[in-house]
Protein backbone atom coordinates (compact mmCIF):
# COMPACT_ATOMS: atom_id res chain seq x y z
CA UNK A 1 0.00 0.00 0.00
CA UNK A 2 1.46 3.28 -1.11
CA UNK A 3 1.46 6.59 0.68
CA UNK A 4 -1.14 8.97 -0.71
CA UNK A 5 0.96 12.00 0.16
CA UNK A 6 3.86 10.76 -1.85
CA UNK A 7 1.68 10.33 -4.93
CA UNK A 8 0.35 13.81 -4.45
CA UNK A 9 3.78 15.41 -4.37
CA UNK A 10 4.92 13.27 -7.28
CA UNK A 11 2.11 14.51 -9.48
CA UNK A 12 2.74 18.06 -8.37
CA UNK A 13 6.43 17.93 -9.17
CA UNK A 14 5.69 16.57 -12.61
CA UNK A 15 3.21 19.32 -13.36
CA UNK A 16 5.56 22.07 -12.07
CA UNK A 17 8.03 23.05 -14.86
CA UNK A 18 10.18 25.17 -12.49
CA UNK A 19 11.20 22.28 -10.34
CA UNK A 20 13.74 19.76 -11.64
CA UNK A 21 14.14 17.42 -8.70
CA UNK A 22 13.48 13.70 -9.18
CA UNK A 23 10.52 11.94 -7.68
CA UNK A 24 10.29 10.25 -4.32
CA UNK A 25 11.87 7.04 -5.59
CA UNK A 26 15.35 8.59 -5.27
CA UNK A 27 17.40 7.66 -2.26
CA UNK A 28 17.03 10.01 0.65
CA UNK A 29 20.05 11.86 1.95
CA UNK A 30 21.75 10.36 4.96
CA UNK A 31 21.36 13.61 6.99
CA UNK A 32 17.91 15.04 6.41
CA UNK A 33 17.44 18.71 7.19
CA UNK A 34 14.32 20.35 8.58
CA UNK A 35 11.83 21.59 6.01
CA UNK A 36 11.95 25.15 4.83
CA UNK A 37 8.75 27.08 5.10
CA UNK A 38 8.46 29.40 2.15
CA UNK A 39 7.57 33.03 2.85
CA UNK A 40 4.04 34.18 2.63
CA UNK A 41 4.78 36.17 -0.51
CA UNK A 42 5.88 33.11 -2.48
CA UNK A 43 3.19 31.38 -4.60
CA UNK A 44 3.16 28.35 -6.86
CA UNK A 45 1.58 28.61 -10.25
CA UNK A 46 0.78 25.19 -11.82
CA UNK A 47 0.17 24.75 -15.52
CA UNK A 48 -3.46 23.75 -15.05
CA UNK A 49 -4.36 27.39 -14.28
CA UNK A 50 -6.23 26.81 -11.01
CA UNK A 51 -4.64 28.30 -7.89
CA UNK A 52 -4.20 25.73 -5.18
CA UNK A 53 -2.22 25.70 -1.96
CA UNK A 54 -1.21 22.34 -0.55
CA UNK A 55 -2.09 21.71 3.07
CA UNK A 56 0.83 21.46 5.47
CA UNK A 57 1.93 17.85 5.87
CA UNK A 58 1.68 16.43 9.38
CA UNK A 59 4.91 14.49 9.04
CA UNK A 60 8.10 15.41 7.21
CA UNK A 61 8.25 13.85 3.74
CA UNK A 62 11.07 11.49 2.94
CA UNK A 63 12.07 13.57 -0.07
CA UNK A 64 15.16 15.79 0.24
CA UNK A 65 14.63 19.46 1.16
CA UNK A 66 14.74 22.27 -1.33
CA UNK A 67 18.40 23.14 -0.98
CA UNK A 68 18.65 25.06 -4.20
CA UNK A 69 15.80 27.43 -3.36
CA UNK A 70 17.79 29.24 -0.69
CA UNK A 71 20.14 31.15 -3.05
CA UNK A 72 17.14 32.20 -5.12
CA UNK A 73 15.43 33.65 -2.05
CA UNK A 74 18.61 35.38 -0.84
CA UNK A 75 19.09 37.06 -4.19
CA UNK A 76 15.78 38.86 -3.88
CA UNK A 77 16.53 42.57 -3.08
CA UNK A 78 13.14 43.29 -1.54
CA UNK A 79 13.33 40.55 1.09
CA UNK A 80 17.02 40.90 2.03
CA UNK A 81 16.45 42.17 5.55
CA UNK A 82 13.59 39.73 6.14
CA UNK A 83 15.64 36.79 4.88
CA UNK A 84 18.44 37.73 7.23
CA UNK A 85 16.11 37.47 10.26
CA UNK A 86 14.53 34.22 9.04
CA UNK A 87 17.89 32.64 8.37
CA UNK A 88 19.12 33.67 11.79
CA UNK A 89 16.11 32.16 13.60
CA UNK A 90 15.03 29.14 11.58
CA UNK A 91 17.59 28.21 8.94
CA UNK A 92 21.07 26.87 9.11
CA UNK A 93 24.00 29.17 8.37
CA UNK A 94 24.52 29.83 4.72
CA UNK A 95 27.92 29.37 3.10
CA UNK A 96 30.15 32.49 2.73
CA UNK A 97 29.43 32.58 -0.99
CA UNK A 98 26.05 34.29 -0.61
CA UNK A 99 25.42 37.80 -1.87
CA UNK A 100 25.04 39.23 1.65
CA UNK A 101 28.40 37.86 2.64
CA UNK A 102 29.93 39.22 -0.53
CA UNK A 103 28.42 42.62 0.17
CA UNK A 104 29.68 42.49 3.75
CA UNK A 105 33.17 41.59 2.53
CA UNK A 106 33.11 44.46 0.08
CA UNK A 107 31.99 46.88 2.79
CA UNK A 108 34.63 45.55 5.16
CA UNK A 109 37.33 45.94 2.54
CA UNK A 110 36.14 49.46 1.73
CA UNK A 111 36.23 50.37 5.42
CA UNK A 112 39.68 48.89 5.70
CA UNK A 113 40.85 50.91 2.70
CA UNK A 114 39.30 54.03 4.19
CA UNK A 115 41.12 53.41 7.44
CA UNK A 116 44.35 52.93 5.54
CA UNK A 117 43.74 56.17 3.68
CA UNK A 118 43.06 57.97 6.96
CA UNK A 119 46.22 56.58 8.47
CA UNK A 120 48.12 57.64 5.41
CA UNK A 121 46.68 61.15 5.62
CA UNK A 122 47.58 61.42 9.29
CA UNK A 123 51.10 60.24 8.57
CA UNK A 124 51.50 62.85 5.85
CA UNK A 125 50.18 65.57 8.17
CA UNK A 126 52.88 64.87 10.76
CA UNK A 127 55.92 67.17 10.69
CA UNK A 128 59.13 66.03 12.35
CA UNK A 129 61.53 68.77 13.38
CA UNK A 130 61.20 72.52 13.73
CA UNK A 131 57.98 74.04 12.34
CA UNK A 132 58.45 75.75 9.01
CA UNK A 133 56.46 78.99 8.66
CA UNK A 134 54.17 79.48 5.74
CA UNK A 135 54.74 81.99 2.97
CA UNK A 136 52.33 84.49 4.55
CA UNK A 137 54.07 84.26 7.92
CA UNK A 138 57.48 84.72 6.29
CA UNK A 139 56.22 87.80 4.46
CA UNK A 140 54.87 89.32 7.68
CA UNK A 141 58.14 88.62 9.51
CA UNK A 142 60.16 90.22 6.73
CA UNK A 143 57.92 93.29 6.76
CA UNK A 144 58.28 93.64 10.55
CA UNK A 145 62.09 93.29 10.42
CA UNK A 146 62.37 95.78 7.56
CA UNK A 147 60.16 98.30 9.37
CA UNK A 148 62.17 97.97 12.61
CA UNK A 149 65.48 98.34 10.77
CA UNK A 150 64.19 101.36 8.87
CA UNK A 151 62.99 102.96 12.12
CA UNK A 152 66.37 102.36 13.74
CA UNK A 153 68.10 103.87 10.70
CA UNK A 154 65.79 106.88 10.80
CA UNK A 155 66.48 107.49 14.50
CA UNK A 156 70.22 107.15 13.87
CA UNK A 157 70.13 109.70 11.04
CA UNK A 158 68.08 112.08 13.17
CA UNK A 159 70.59 111.80 16.02
CA UNK A 160 73.57 112.38 13.74
CA UNK A 161 71.93 115.35 11.99
CA UNK A 162 71.00 116.93 15.32
CA UNK A 163 74.53 116.46 16.64
CA UNK A 164 76.02 117.97 13.48
CA UNK A 165 73.76 121.00 13.79
CA UNK A 166 74.75 121.54 17.41
CA UNK A 167 78.44 121.05 16.64
CA UNK A 168 78.18 123.56 13.81
CA UNK A 169 76.47 126.04 16.10
CA UNK A 170 79.08 125.80 18.86
CA UNK A 171 82.08 125.62 16.51
CA UNK A 172 81.04 128.96 14.94
CA UNK A 173 80.57 130.63 18.31
CA UNK A 174 76.80 130.87 18.12
CA UNK A 175 75.31 132.22 21.34
CA UNK A 176 71.73 132.58 22.52
CA UNK A 177 70.36 136.09 22.53
CA UNK A 178 67.53 135.63 24.99
CA UNK A 179 64.78 133.44 26.28
CA UNK A 180 63.37 132.65 22.84
CA UNK A 181 66.70 131.39 21.53
CA UNK A 182 67.20 129.08 24.44
CA UNK A 183 63.69 127.72 24.14
CA UNK A 184 64.29 127.03 20.46
CA UNK A 185 67.43 125.10 21.29
CA UNK A 186 65.47 122.87 23.63
CA UNK A 187 62.31 122.45 21.58
CA UNK A 188 59.29 120.38 22.37
CA UNK A 189 61.20 117.10 22.25
CA UNK A 190 64.30 118.34 24.00
CA UNK A 191 64.09 115.57 26.57
CA UNK A 192 64.05 112.92 23.84
CA UNK A 193 67.04 114.50 22.15
CA UNK A 194 68.98 114.60 25.39
CA UNK A 195 68.25 110.95 26.12
CA UNK A 196 69.41 109.95 22.65
CA UNK A 197 72.54 112.12 22.76
CA UNK A 198 73.74 110.61 26.02
CA UNK A 199 74.14 107.15 24.53
CA UNK A 200 77.82 106.65 23.71
CA UNK A 201 78.43 110.25 22.54
CA UNK A 202 80.78 112.89 23.92
CA UNK A 203 81.98 116.42 23.27
CA UNK A 204 85.46 118.02 23.24
CA UNK A 205 84.99 121.81 23.47
CA UNK A 206 87.72 124.24 22.49
CA UNK A 207 89.44 126.46 25.10
CA UNK A 208 87.50 129.52 23.93
CA UNK A 209 84.22 127.67 24.32
CA UNK A 210 85.23 126.56 27.81
CA UNK A 211 86.27 130.03 29.00
CA UNK A 212 83.54 132.06 27.35
CA UNK A 213 80.76 129.53 27.66
CA UNK A 214 78.51 128.02 25.01
CA UNK A 215 75.62 130.37 25.78
CA UNK A 216 75.62 134.03 26.73
CA UNK A 217 72.57 135.92 27.99
CA UNK A 218 72.86 139.68 27.58
CA UNK A 219 71.03 142.26 29.65
CA UNK A 220 68.95 144.49 27.33
CA UNK A 221 69.60 147.54 29.54
CA UNK A 222 73.34 147.50 30.25
CA UNK A 223 74.35 144.69 27.87
CA UNK A 224 76.10 142.73 30.57
CA UNK A 225 76.44 139.06 29.67
CA UNK A 226 75.64 136.07 31.84
CA UNK A 227 76.21 132.37 31.38
CA UNK A 228 72.87 131.51 32.98
CA UNK A 229 69.46 132.94 32.28
CA UNK A 230 68.46 132.96 35.95
CA UNK A 231 71.42 135.19 36.80
CA UNK A 232 70.44 137.62 34.07
CA UNK A 233 66.85 137.76 35.37
CA UNK A 234 67.99 138.56 38.90
CA UNK A 235 70.31 141.22 37.49
CA UNK A 236 67.44 142.82 35.58
CA UNK A 237 65.42 143.10 38.77
CA UNK A 238 67.94 145.72 39.88
CA UNK A 239 67.04 147.91 36.92
CA UNK A 240 63.48 148.40 38.11
CA UNK A 241 60.22 146.77 39.05
CA UNK A 242 59.06 146.82 35.45
CA UNK A 243 61.39 143.90 34.77
CA UNK A 244 59.93 141.72 37.48
CA UNK A 245 57.75 138.99 36.02
CA UNK A 246 57.06 137.00 39.16
CA UNK A 247 58.64 133.84 40.54
CA UNK A 248 58.09 131.97 37.28
CA UNK A 249 60.57 134.27 35.53
CA UNK A 250 63.42 132.77 37.56
CA UNK A 251 62.76 129.27 36.36
CA UNK A 252 64.56 129.86 33.11
CA UNK A 253 64.84 127.01 30.66
CA UNK A 254 66.41 123.61 30.67
CA UNK A 255 69.98 123.34 29.35
CA UNK A 256 70.48 122.21 25.80
CA UNK A 257 71.41 118.67 24.86
CA UNK A 258 75.05 119.50 24.21
CA UNK A 259 75.51 120.83 27.75
CA UNK A 260 74.57 117.42 29.14
CA UNK A 261 76.99 115.43 27.02
CA UNK A 262 80.07 113.90 28.67
CA UNK A 263 83.07 116.10 27.88
CA UNK A 264 86.79 115.44 27.48
CA UNK A 265 89.42 118.03 28.28
CA UNK A 266 91.30 119.52 25.33
CA UNK A 267 94.55 120.16 27.28
CA UNK A 268 97.36 117.75 26.25
CA UNK A 269 98.62 115.45 28.99
CA UNK A 270 95.54 115.97 31.16
CA UNK A 271 94.10 112.96 32.89
CA UNK A 272 90.72 113.81 31.38
CA UNK A 273 92.12 114.07 27.85
CA UNK A 274 90.83 111.50 25.41
CA UNK A 275 94.39 110.45 24.44
CA UNK A 276 95.31 109.60 28.02
CA UNK A 277 95.74 105.85 28.71
CA UNK A 278 93.29 106.07 31.62
CA UNK A 279 91.08 108.79 30.16
CA UNK A 280 87.82 109.45 31.93
CA UNK A 281 85.28 111.97 30.64
CA UNK A 282 83.78 114.65 32.84
CA UNK A 283 80.08 114.55 33.58
CA UNK A 284 78.92 117.62 31.63
CA UNK A 285 80.06 120.97 30.29
CA UNK A 286 79.74 122.83 33.60
CA UNK A 287 82.05 120.34 35.30
CA UNK A 288 84.52 120.71 32.43
CA UNK A 289 84.49 124.50 32.83
CA UNK A 290 85.39 124.26 36.52
CA UNK A 291 88.04 121.61 35.84
CA UNK A 292 89.71 123.61 33.08
CA UNK A 293 89.82 126.81 35.12
CA UNK A 294 91.31 125.07 38.15
CA UNK A 295 93.88 122.92 36.36
CA UNK A 296 94.76 124.77 33.17
CA UNK A 297 93.45 128.34 33.47
CA UNK A 298 94.79 131.50 35.03
CA UNK A 299 94.21 132.23 38.73
CA UNK A 300 93.04 135.82 39.11
CA UNK A 301 91.72 135.51 42.67
CA UNK A 302 94.21 135.77 45.56
CA UNK A 303 93.73 135.37 49.29
CA UNK A 304 94.34 138.60 51.23
CA UNK A 305 95.67 136.70 54.26
CA UNK A 306 98.05 134.15 52.83
CA UNK A 307 98.36 135.22 49.20
CA UNK A 308 97.17 131.91 47.72
CA UNK A 309 95.78 132.26 44.17
CA UNK A 310 92.54 130.68 42.93
CA UNK A 311 90.96 130.28 39.51
CA UNK A 312 87.37 129.89 40.68
CA UNK A 313 85.63 132.63 42.61
CA UNK A 314 83.81 130.20 44.92
CA UNK A 315 87.03 128.50 45.96
CA UNK A 316 88.65 131.83 46.77
CA UNK A 317 85.76 133.08 48.94
CA UNK A 318 85.54 129.86 50.92
CA UNK A 319 89.27 129.78 51.54
CA UNK A 320 89.53 133.42 52.60
CA UNK A 321 86.73 132.94 55.10
CA UNK A 322 88.56 130.18 56.96
CA UNK A 323 92.17 131.17 56.21
CA UNK A 324 94.49 131.12 59.24
CA UNK A 325 91.96 129.40 61.44
CA UNK A 326 92.93 126.11 63.08
CA UNK A 327 90.61 123.39 64.32
CA UNK A 328 91.88 121.38 67.27
CA UNK A 329 91.11 117.87 68.47
CA UNK A 330 91.31 116.79 72.14
CA UNK A 331 94.03 114.36 71.09
CA UNK A 332 96.31 117.31 70.15
CA UNK A 333 95.92 117.29 66.38
CA UNK A 334 95.15 120.53 64.53
CA UNK A 335 93.47 121.02 61.16
CA UNK A 336 93.08 123.93 58.79
CA UNK A 337 89.54 123.02 57.85
CA UNK A 338 86.54 122.13 59.94
CA UNK A 339 85.63 119.34 57.56
CA UNK A 340 88.97 117.67 58.17
CA UNK A 341 88.45 117.67 61.93
CA UNK A 342 85.00 116.09 61.51
CA UNK A 343 86.43 113.34 59.36
CA UNK A 344 89.16 112.74 61.93
CA UNK A 345 86.64 112.36 64.77
CA UNK A 346 84.44 110.09 62.71
CA UNK A 347 87.35 107.85 61.77
CA UNK A 348 88.81 107.32 65.26
CA UNK A 349 85.65 107.51 67.37
CA UNK A 350 86.03 107.46 71.17
CA UNK A 351 88.72 109.69 72.69
CA UNK A 352 88.51 112.26 69.89
CA UNK A 353 86.48 115.44 69.62
CA UNK A 354 86.58 119.18 68.99
CA UNK A 355 88.49 121.28 71.54
CA UNK A 356 87.56 124.84 72.47
CA UNK A 357 85.13 125.32 69.58
CA UNK A 358 81.61 126.70 70.01
CA UNK A 359 78.94 125.62 67.55
CA UNK A 360 81.03 122.81 66.11
CA UNK A 361 78.00 120.63 65.33
CA UNK A 362 76.30 123.36 63.32
CA UNK A 363 76.06 122.81 59.60
CA UNK A 364 78.55 124.82 57.61
CA UNK A 365 78.59 125.60 53.91
CA UNK A 366 80.03 122.87 51.71
CA UNK A 367 83.68 123.21 50.91
CA UNK A 368 84.87 123.63 47.35
CA UNK A 369 86.68 120.95 45.43
CA UNK A 370 90.09 122.50 46.08
CA UNK A 371 89.50 122.66 49.83
CA UNK A 372 88.17 119.13 49.84
CA UNK A 373 91.43 117.91 48.29
CA UNK A 374 93.41 119.82 50.90
CA UNK A 375 91.29 118.28 53.65
CA UNK A 376 91.93 114.79 52.40
CA UNK A 377 95.66 115.47 52.26
CA UNK A 378 95.70 116.78 55.82
CA UNK A 379 93.71 113.80 57.06
CA UNK A 380 96.22 111.41 55.55
CA UNK A 381 99.11 113.26 57.20
CA UNK A 382 97.44 113.26 60.62
CA UNK A 383 96.83 109.50 60.43
From Swiss-Prot:
The fruits of the gain-of-function mutant ntt-3D (T-DNA tagging) fail to dehisce. This is Zinc finger protein WIP2. The lineage of its organism: Eukaryota, Viridiplantae, Streptophyta, Embryophyta, Tracheophyta. Residues 29-38, 54-65 have a biased composition (Pro residues). It is found in: Nucleus. Belongs to the WIP C2H2-type zinc-finger protein family. Transcriptional regulator required for normal differentiation of the ovary transmitting tract cells and pollen tube growth. In Arabidopsis, the transmitting tract facilitates the transport of pollen tubes to the ovules for fertilization. May play a role in the regulation of AGL8/FUL, which is required for normal pattern of cell division, expansion and differentiation during morphogenesis of the silique. Plays a role in replum development by the activation of the homeobox protein KNAT1. GO terms for cellular component: nucleus. A motif (Nuclear localization signal) lies at residues 293-296, 336-339. Residues 361-373 have a biased composition (Acidic residues). Disruption phenotype: Reduced fertility, fruit length and seed set. Reduced replum width and cell number. It comes from Arabidopsis thaliana. Gene3D superfamilies: Classic Zinc Finger.
